[in-house]
Amino acid sequence: MGEGPAVRLLVATRSRHKLGELRELLALADGVELLSPDDLGIPGEPEETGETFETNARIKARFYALRSGLPTLADDSGLEVDALDGGPGVRTRRYSGPDATDASNNELLLRELAGLPAERRGARYVCVLALALPGEMGPRGGLRILVRRGTCRGRIATELRGDGGFGYDPLFEPWSEPPGGETLGQWSAEAKNAISHRSRAAARMAPVLLETGFRA
């Protein structure tokens, strides 16, 4: 992008972990400044009322883009388990209740799937990235928002294994592993990023970022 003032891209998260992960996965061009709502002093959060990851990603991208006037990238992601008809889905973070923790969510998931054989424990991580572009109109009017999706297939283990990653990683066996094999909680960050739902969504968003000047 050459010399000159930084191009600013707002990421719709207050999580430094997610911000750092996206910075690494997106391979942005030199001169792109990645910001969070906290960096800009933007208060509040949108109400995520959607029943799909795409809807909620769009809600977050629109909310922060309109308040900042900056191009905004939003992520909505979670776990879909076949035996739970796609649950916990958009309720992934609060699966075990409003005060849910990773531990309580994993404990509930193990209880829900207790006794099921490996072939009935299929699951996938899903990530949807939405890029809102202030000043550009969408096909139906309003803010232009571009969406890309990535998935990572696997199965739910019968016990927690590994202390790496976060969320359901200690229970998630990637499809490349046999039943009872390693979970994402046992993988290095580099190995996980090579196959993760977020890395696949980021790869599909890369041409969009290139077109809009955020990627070299």
Can you say where each PLM-predicted feature lies in the sequence?
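Anionic-ligand binding patches
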Residues: 2-10, 16-216
